[in-house]
Amino acid sequence: MANIASQKKRIQRSERERRENRFRISQVRTWFRRLEQAVAAGDAGAAESEYRQLLSKIDKAVKTGALHRNAGARRKSRAARIRARLGN
C-alpha cells in the first residue's frame, strides 16, 4: 500500500482509467455481438444501425486509448465483412 499522497491519488486514477477502458471495450464487444445477431437474422435495417453504432464505439475506444489504433481498424474491417454478408 502506498504511503505517499500523490501515489495514492495515482492508484485511484489508474483504477478509474481501468474501469473506463474495460467499459469501452465491453461496449465494443456487445455491439459486435448485436451486429452478428442482426446479420444472422437477416434484418438489414437493424444490421445497418448496429454497424453504425459499433463504428462509433470503436472510434471512441481508440480516441480515449482503450484500444490501439490498429486494433480499432482491424475490428472495423471485421465488422464491415460481417455486414457485407447481408448482400449475399
What are these regions (language model features)?
Residues A2-N88:
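Ribosome large-subunit tunnel/peptidyl-transferase-proximal elements
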